[in-house]
Amino acid sequence: MFFKVCQLGKGRCCQVLLNYASCQRCQLSSYKGTPRLIKAVQGSSKDQQLAGQVQRFGEDSWFVHSAPKSETMGVADGVGGWRQMGIDSGVFAKQLMTNCSKLSEQADYDGRNPRQLLIDGYHRLKEHATNVWGSSTACLVSLHRSDCTLHSANLGDSGFLVLRHGKVLHRSDEQLHVFNTPYQLSVPPTSQMHKVLSDQPEEAICTQLGLQQGDLVLVATDGLFDNVVESELVQQLQQLHGETRVEKVQLAANRLVDLAKRLSLRTDYQSPFALRAKANNMNYGAGGKPDDITVILASVEVSQRSN
C-alpha cells in the first residue's frame, strides 16, 4: 500500500476557495449575537479490538474544542496499510489530533487559519513524538466567532458538508493521488523513509464560508462518505435545521453512523465507493466498504445579546 508517487501540481492544491453566501456572515448586523456550535460526536470501529479507546473509533481520531474566539472540530483517518508492518496508524492519527487540539486552545488562535494548526500539529508530531509512526488524512474546520465564518483545511478524503435549509451549501473537495490513495501526512520508521507516500500539510485545501443561524456542519471520515450518498445525508438531516437541543443533534449523528455501518456491510448496494471503483475500472463489484466511521455534527446557534 505504500509507494512513492510523483506529486504533480502540488501547488494547485493550496488554493483558497471563497464561498460566501451573499456576504450574510450570520447576518450579524441584525443578530448582534455570539455564534456557537451545538456539537455531537459519534463513530464506529471496524475492528472491535480497537473499539472503546478515548477519542478514537478504530484508526480514526477526532477532537472538538471551544474557545472565546473560536470553535474547532477535526477528524483524522489513520491509513490501515500500516498494519502489515505491525503499526497502529490510529496512534498517529490520535497524536495528530491531540496536537491540533492543544494548539487550538492557545489564546491567540481565533479560528481563521486551521491549516496552520495542521502544519504546526504535524511538525510537533514529527519532532517530539517517540515511535509514533504511520500516516493519516486530516480535516479541520474552525468557526471564527466575530464574523461567524467557517474556515477549513482538508487534506485527503475525509471532509465536511455545510447544509442550509435542507440543501448542501458547500462540500469539501477530496485529494487523491489515484483512486483509493488519498493525500496523507506520514511519519515512517527510518527503514521505510524512502518507500512511503507522504504529503505536506501546506497542501491542504483551505476554504472560508459565511454561516447563518440554523446551518449544519457535518465533518466526517471517508467511512461515512464512501457508504452514504449525499442525497441520503441531506434527507437524514433536513429536519435538523435550526435545532439547538444537543440531544437532538446527538441522535442525528447516531443515525448517520448507524446508517453508514449498515450500508457498509451490504453486498447488494451500489455504494459511492463501489461506483467510484467502477468509474476507475476497478473490479470491486457492488457493496459497501467496511471501514471505521467518525462523524462530528454541529448546528449553528447565534445567541441574542441584550441591549
Swiss-Prot record:
Pfam families: SpoIIE. One of its GO terms (cellular component) is mitochondrion. Keywords: Hydrolase, Magnesium, Manganese, Metal-binding, Protein phosphatase. Mn(2+) 2 binds at D77, D222. Mn(2+) 1 binds at D77, G78. Its cofactor is Mg(2+); Mn(2+). SUPFAM superfamilies: PP2C-like. The keyword Transmembrane helix does not apply. GO terms for biological process: dephosphorylation. PROSITE patterns: PPM_2. SMART domains: PP2C_SIG, PP2Cc. Its EC number is 3.1.3.16. Disulfide bonds: none annotated. The keyword Magnesium applies. Residues 41-300 form the PPM-type phosphatase domain. It catalyses: O-phospho-L-seryl-[protein] + H2O = L-seryl-[protein] + phosphate; O-phospho-L-threonyl-[protein] + H2O = L-threonyl-[protein] + phosphate. One of its GO terms (molecular function) is protein serine/threonine phosphatase activity. It is an enzyme of class 3 (hydrolase). PANTHER family: PROTEIN PHOSPHATASE 2C (PTHR12320), PROTEIN PHOSPHATASE PTC7 HOMOLOG (PTHR12320:SF1). Belongs to the PP2C family. This is Protein phosphatase PTC7 homolog fig.
